[in-house]
Amino acid sequence: MDALRAMWKGTISFGLVTIPVKLYAATESKDLRFNLLHEPCQTPVQYRKYCPTCEREVESGEIVKGYEFDRGRYVTLRDEDFESIPLAARRTLEIVAFVRLEEIDPIYFDKTYYLEPGEGGAKAYGLLRHAMEVTGRVAIARVVLRAKESLAALRVFREGVLAMETMHFPDEVRPVAALTGIAQPELRPQEIEMATGLIESLTMPFSPERFENTYREALLELIQAKIAGAPPAEPGPAPEQGRVVDLMEALRASIRAAEAQRAAGGATGGAAGADGTPPAPVARSPEAPARRAIPGLPGDPAASVPGVPAAPVPRAPGVTGAPTPGTPPAAVPGVPATAVPGTPGAPVPTAPGVPSAPAPGTSPTSVPGVQTAPNGAAPPGPFAGSDRAAEVGPDETAPGGP
């Protein structure tokens, strides 16, 4: 593991106690970077600092920062101007309050850092950490990083490490009043019950390791294939858009699909075991509420929504066990189906998105106005605006380019 490099050194001011600390970035971007090339010769394009008035390139020493206070009029500021601003917190994390973490809306959080005690600060660092653990509080502080003052929240992270989250000031958070499309529609009790049931069926302990950057992996595979000279892969078929049906049926189908997904390996389609068996679903958290019976699904004695047939829950491919009473077993690829006495031997119809034939007289369902998006697009990344080659993300266009 590569050693971390401290990006800031200072002190935590805790009353009359000062704690020397070092600051490290806690996260790093894994975005792939792409150079912009001149296609005929495959040479990286350069961006030069050019003054259109003087009609020449300018050196770095000739460049200053300017604030446009009127159209075309600037006031310039130099490094010594920024240094002259009286900020007591320039090299100090000044703790000004302690609050409970749940009182802070996550929208205020910006970037995360690790704090490590500096020379001679281990005991005071440990004392602050222990006191915060005992009281269940996080510290609110002021800090200046890169000539910008920020609010910050200090909290106990893990393995005895204090983490610092820089925070936005209130005037940096846009008001929700600017959103005009938020409505309060009337909801039927059955719809609420089905929606909460879908949430419960997808509830599991949070485990970051379950979630992978599938877009980045696919992009790396594409790059490796092009390096090896492999022909480009044919694009897959676009997902079919089912006809718009009742919201209740769409929710019911979503619950069936979620249950099948959990049985098949969870949120990310977990890898099979060494013997080829599918992974076991993640156990529910002890704090998670027990699932309630959902109208129209097995386990609820009440009748389903009038006019909407309730299909039995499908079994996930490769998962064995007794079928739901009164329903035929799901077809497993390569395994002959065993007929249940008194029932036909046809496979159980499944929800849209679960491979199987649809039930007679039904069509794939979708929620009005909701479209399925492909796996997340690569987030745009910054590019270097200097006289070296620009680096941009896959969907970015460099400003001021040729």
From Swiss-Prot:
InterPro entries: Ku70/Ku80_beta-barrel_dom, Prok_Ku, SPOC-like_C_dom_sf. Coiled coil: none annotated. Residues 299-308, 332-343, 359-376 have a biased composition (Low complexity). GO terms for biological process: DNA recombination; double-strand break repair via nonhomologous end joining. The keyword DNA repair applies. Residues 344-358 have a biased composition (Pro residues). Keywords: DNA damage, DNA recombination, DNA repair, DNA-binding. GO terms for molecular function: double-stranded DNA binding. It holds the Pfam family Ku. Residues 12-185 form the Ku domain. Residues 261-402 are annotated as: Disordered. Belongs to the prokaryotic Ku family. Homodimer. Interacts with LigD. NCBIfam families: Ku_bact (TIGR02772). With LigD forms a non-homologous end joining (NHEJ) DNA repair enzyme, which repairs dsDNA breaks with reduced fidelity. Binds linear dsDNA with 5'- and 3'- overhangs but not closed circular dsDNA nor ssDNA. Recruits and stimulates the ligase activity of LigD. HAMAP family: Prokaryotic_Ku. This is Non-homologous end joining protein Ku. It comes from Symbiobacterium thermophilum (strain DSM 24528 / JCM 14929 / IAM 14863 / T).
